[in-house]
Regions:
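Hydrophobic residues at beta-strand termini and immediately following loops
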Residues: 4, 57, 114, 176
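Rossmann-fold NAD(P)-binding glycine/threonine-rich loop
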Residues: 41-55, 147-199
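Generic structural signal for residues in well-ordered beta-strands
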Residues: 1-3, 111, 173
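Glycine-rich phosphate/diphosphate-binding loop of Rossmann-like nucleotide-binding domains
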Residues: 8, 24, 65-152, 157-170
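Anion-binding alpha/beta catalytic cores of soluble intermediary-metabolism enzymes, centered on
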Residues: 28-82, 123, 138
Length: 200
């Protein structure tokens, strides 16, 4: 594996050109987000061929997005019984929320995808599982939660990395750091191996 760093003033054209060059030499390529505001994420991702998009960001990617797939695989490993379970996903991004809802629906869970206008307390109370991917430190702390929580949040408070649900003693919450981020990296590696086997 190789990591390439580029100056923040790299233009969109230069980055896309570099990606199109690098994909010739690797089985899998990913772009670390966020990008500087002058570079469109869509343009950078589109430069990666679908069979090498191991992060699963393209709509036509040959791979499921790494973070959602890592979460589902982890819950499978833990023995989570999907059929008929009420799952609330808070955050409807194209990278986590929406693809995760699709994967969990395919497992026969009943999924509610919430956003900033949702009345969360109604959904949270009835949930068998909550996934929070808001990106707001302590977002869930004010809600009475009686089920497991998968915390996808990445936030910094006083220089420390924390999730969307932290300082919650006694709650069944995946840790940040050391939780979903590790699952994402593991799934990325699995996708790279698959890319090599299928297309290498």
């Amino acid at each position: 594996a190789e990591v390439y760093f580029y100056p923040e003033n790299t233009t969109e054209f230069e980055l896309v050109d570099e990606i199109e060059h690098l994909v010739e030499f690797y089985d899998g390529v990913m772009v670390q987000l966020p990008l500087p505001p002058h570079i469109r994420v869509e343009a950078a991702i589109a430069a990666i061929p679908k069979e090498k998009d191991v992060d699963g960001f393209r709509r036509d990617s040959c791979f499921d997005p790494a973070t959602p797939l890592g979460i589902v695989n982890y819950l499978d490993y833990c023995g989570f019984e999907w059929t008929g379970k009420e799952v609330t996903i808070i955050g409807r991004s194209d990278i986590v929320g929406k693809p995760l809802a699709r994967l969990m629906t395919n497992k026969d869970a009943t999924v509610t995808l919430c956003h900033s206008k949702s009345k969360l307390s109604n959904h949270i109370y009835d949930s068998d599982l909550i996934v929070c991917a808001v990106g707001q430190a302590g977002f869930l702390n004010c809600y009475p939660i009686h089920c497991p929580v998968v915390d996808v949040g990445i936030n910094f408070v006083d220089g420390k990395l924390v999730g969307d649900c932290y300082n919650t003693d006694g709650r069944n919450v995946t840790p940040v750091p050391g939780g979903v981020g590790l699952l994402t990296r593991l799934t990325l590696l699995e996708n790279v191996v698959k890319a090599k086997e299928m297309y290498g």
